UniProtKB/Swiss-Prot annotation:
This is Biotrophy-associated secreted protein 4. It comes from the Eukaryota. Induction: Expression is highly up-regulated in invasive hyphae. Keywords: Glycoprotein, Secreted, Signal. Secreted effector involved in biotrophic colonization of plant cells. Participates in transition from the biotrophic to the necrotrophic phase of Magnaporthe oryzae. Elicits rice basic defense responses during the early stage of interaction and promotes cell death in the late stage of compatible interaction. Glycans are attached at residue 36. Coiled coil: none annotated. Residues 1-21 form the signal peptide. The keyword Glycoprotein applies. It is found in: Secreted.
């Protein structure tokens, strides 16, 4: 039984990593705190969304509902967005990105 649980855990880990690289319709930048809680980072989300649009990575990206980077064409690449949150907008405190809850 333990082997089955381990196999499932490994498969889930790969599925999560794979989903990061997928194209998305909505993403947000997040900041993770030392207690492992995280919160959406609106300033970094705006910066990352603007950076991707300005640099031709997501032509239809806009800020939606005043909190999400949104692409009708689902052209938000998870890896590119996270890179924009953390490295292209480094002074805004984002530590990663996330698919927002529905």
């Amino acid at each position: 039984m333990q082997l089955s649980f381990s196999a499932i855990a490994i498969l889930l880990a790969f599925a999560v990593n794979h989903a990061t690289a997928d194209s998305h319709q909505n993403l947000v930048c997040v900041r993770t705190y030392p207690d492992n809680n995280s919160a959406e980072n609106l300033e970094a989300t705006r910066c990352a969304c603007d950076w991707l649009k300005k640099n031709g990575k997501c032509d239809d990206c806009t800020i939606w509902e005043n909190r999400l980077c949104h692409s009708d064409a689902k052209s938000l690449d998870g890896n590119e967005f996270e890179d924009a949150c953390v490295r292209k907008c480094p002074n805004l405190g984002a530590t990663g990105s996330s698919i927002p809850p529905a």
